[in-house]
Amino acid sequence: MWTFPDYIPGQLPDWQALERRFSWFADMKDVPQDPEWHAEGDVFTHTKMVCEALLQLPEFQALDEQEQHILFAAAMLHDVEKRSTTKSEIENGKERIVSPHHAKKGEHTARTLLYTELAAPFAVREAIAKLVRLHGLPLWAINKPNPERAVIAASLQVNTEHLAMLAKADVLGRICCDQQDILLRIDLFRELCEENACWGKARTFASDYGRYLY
């Protein structure tokens, strides 16, 4: 079984050990976030809060040990590339802090780190990388032009139940005024997946060709 270093299921992470071990984690310190969406502070603080929120979820605690290590790794890495994408811009006359495409870039970084530093086997590596890439989807799926297609397509790449857990922890691990509204969006994501037969599993198709066309 693959395990994430310095993490033991059922115990709080050793944050100091993780910071010493991983430069990419230490890099998150002092990377700013917009205070309207992340009043808790920098990316380092947020990442720790997300991981600790994840560990408290009953649905996370019900997973097997391998799945817990996969999700913990995804939580650690979900904002890894905010360090390289964060910038200030003016929006409607107000300065905002944004991190465009951090999830897309983070997927590639996560895959590389999991191969070079963490010796994750292929299936584990891809599961984590895709969780990083899609971690924001449960928050925005309902606003997509075609929400059904969005969740079905996601289910072909990632376990949507695990994705919802990561998104829930991401929301609980921040301080913002619209937290309950965002959590409702995650509930709607689950309903959308259930209605389209892709909650916690890949949507099945009548044939491989049908899946390819989709």
Predicted regions and their residues:
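A sequence-level detector of short, solvent-exposed, charge-rich linear segments
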Residues: F44, E95, R125, R133, ...
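Charged substrate- and nucleic-acid-binding regions of tRNA-handling and nucleotidyl-transfer enzymes
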Residues: M1, Q61, Q157-A167, V171-Y214
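Exposed alpha-helical structural elements
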Residues: T3, D14-D27, M49, A123, ...
